Amino acid sequence: RREGQKNIYVETCPQYLLLTEDKFRDGGPEEGIKYMMAPPLRKKEDNEAIWQGLRDGSVQVIATDHCPFTEKEKLENVADFRNCPGGVSGVEERMPLLFSEGVLKGRISLERFVQATSTNAAKIFGLYPKKGTLMPGSDADVILINPAKTHTFGRNTLHTTCGYSPYDGMTTDCAIDLVMLRGQIIARDNTFTGQKGYGTLLHRKRTIAYEDIVRV
C-alpha cells in the first residue's frame, strides 16, 4: 500500500509480532476478552509477515499502543465484546520482549532493533539527533539489556495499574538492568529510582528525509 508513496510509514507493536488470535479462545470468554484491541490479533503467518517487514525495512517502527484497562473494565463487557474497551499494556514489556524474541532468536539484527525501537521514531517525529542516537550533543537516553539474565512477566513484576499483562507467564532471555534519561539513572533492576518532575517538553523539528528513515 505504501509502495511508491513518500512520507508513509508503518508501525507495529509487540502483540502483533508475538500473539495470535488463539488468545481469544484460550481460557474461554473471560480470558479472551482481555485481548480485545484494534486491530485485532491475527494468525501466526501474519506475525511472520510483520517480522519479515522489519527485516526488509518496510516496517519502520515498533511502538506499544499502550492503552490498558483493568480486568474489571474488560469483564464488564464479556457478554458483548463490541462494548469492550480495546487495548493492552506494552510500555514495560516492549524492549525485553523484542530483544529476546527478535535479536536473540535471530529474527532481526541488533541494528534493526535499535532503528525500529528508537532511531526511526525520533527521525519521523523531528526529535533526531537529540533523541534516537548516541552522539555528542544527544540526550544520554540509554537502556542496558542483560542477556545473561531472564525475566518473567507477571502481576507482581509490572508497574501498570491494570493488574495484568497480555504476556503474563512469558519469560524473556534477557532483563533490563537500568534505564537512563539524559544521563541520569531513573530505573534499576525493575525499580523506578527517578525524580518526579524530571521530564521536559520536547519541541520537534522537521521530519528527517524519507529516504534516510527507510533505507536498509
Give names to the regions the model predicted:
Residues 76-80, 136-202:
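C-terminal cap of metal-dependent C-N hydrolases
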Residues 30-35, 61-62, 68-149:
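His/Asp/Glu-enriched, well-ordered alpha-helical/loop segment
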